[in-house]
Amino acid sequence: MASSHTVLMRLVASAYSIAQKAGTIVRCVIAEGDLGIVQKTSATDLQTKADRLVQMSICSSLARKFPKLTIIGEEDLPPGEVDQELIEDGQWEEILKQPCPSQYSAIKEEDLVVWVDPLDGTKEYTEGLLDNVTVLIGIAYEGKAIAGIINQPYYNYQAGPDAALGRTIWGVLGLGAFGFQLKEAPAGKHIITTTRSHSNQLVTDCISAMNPDTVLRVGGAGNKIIQLIEGKASAYVFASPGCKKWDTCAPEVILHAVGGKLTDIHGNALQYNKEVKHMNSAGVLAALRNYEYYASHVPESVKNALIP
């Protein structure tokens, strides 16, 4: 019975099923051939039909089941009736079998803030770089990201017709992260992943100071954190404003649950309470291992230019 499970684990189990449905919606929009692209603030800040439908699906599905939640989504959508086909009311039973970490067992619905990025890597989505795309649902308590779900709609899309398309990664602090194979980047190598479409001199200066062996430029914050946990990159460095709370909330949980660290460029933890400003104005610095190496190499000039 649902009542025997904690609010947090019921929410995570529901968000998992909702994220899977979101992945299906993302694939359907591509298959139909009309992305419905709208330019928001610039040529690199885009919104598609998938962004709109997925946000409606996630936010409405969560709000129906958990009416006291605070839900903050990336897209500014007009209120209105949501098509019943977009509603997902299932929950992933495997998650309900897991124990809730004791520090979260008494959390109430109204204590939680959910940060939603319906399509992280929208620009890449419009350009056919489908492996960059993720759906992000992050859950915060007392300003801290404590649970997260990442759906990769096109995971395996280049692995041949017999490969299962898409996957969902999830994690809860104090419990762990699941749905992927943890792998560390090669020891002694500094492989840095950073922005593909929002670079500037600060970003370049910060990365150069870290003596990188390789620099990967890819889309999506969720995608970059997946690179860290799967050993494709050693650090994620973005010394610039631009990234928002819905970009980092879910990925941060997955990284922290396996022993990594994500902060702003100054080393401060990011805050996720409902009143906080949405922009991560002091950038992002993350690593699975050896975080201190990267933090110690951030130039003072870069820190001085980025005010938290």
Curated annotation (Swiss-Prot):
Active-site residues from the entry: D51 (proton acceptor), T122 (proton acceptor)
pH-linked activity: Optimum pH is approximately 7.5.
Tissue expression notes: Widely expressed. Highly expressed in kidney.
Phosphothreonine carried by residues: T122
Any Pfam family: Inositol_P
Activity regulation statement: Uncompetitively inhibited by Li(+) (IC(50)=157 uM). PAP hydrolysis is competitively inhibited by PAPS (IC(50)=0.7 uM) and by inositol 1,4-bisphosphate (IC(50)=15 uM).
Homology family: Belongs to the inositol monophosphatase superfamily.
This protein's name: 3'(2'),5'-bisphosphate nucleotidase 1
